[in-house]
Amino acid sequence: MASGEDDLIARYFRPLATDPGALGLVDDAAVLTSSGDDLVVTTDAVVEGVHFLPGDPPDTIARKALRVNLSDLAAKGAVPAGFVLTLALREAKEAWLAPFARALGEDAAAFNCPVLGGDTVSTPGPLMISITAF
């Protein structure tokens, strides 16, 4: 998604980047300010055909992808600070990305866990979403 990656990020995910550490999602990395407390980090991937079915609604997939990570943080007694998102997509389709991004943004706001960075790539394989939360 080399040339279209910037457009995809600008349209669907930059509006979700509400934390200053996201730096407007112009890079794959985020800047975090440490408070001196321990930082709990977790990562989970969800893969089409393994963790969800090809016809599952994109909003449901988005919520699952984020919530499995938030559950891991909660299990450690951690308060979420943000997450980075990796999407491996066969195609960048509006009909799929719009509800995915909307649901991801709703959950990110509800759990005070903003997107801070990430990556998008194209793949001939199944859809894969990976989130690293902290």
Regions of interest found by a model, annotated:
Residues 7-11, 68, 72, 103:
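Alpha-helical scaffold segments in soluble metabolic enzymes
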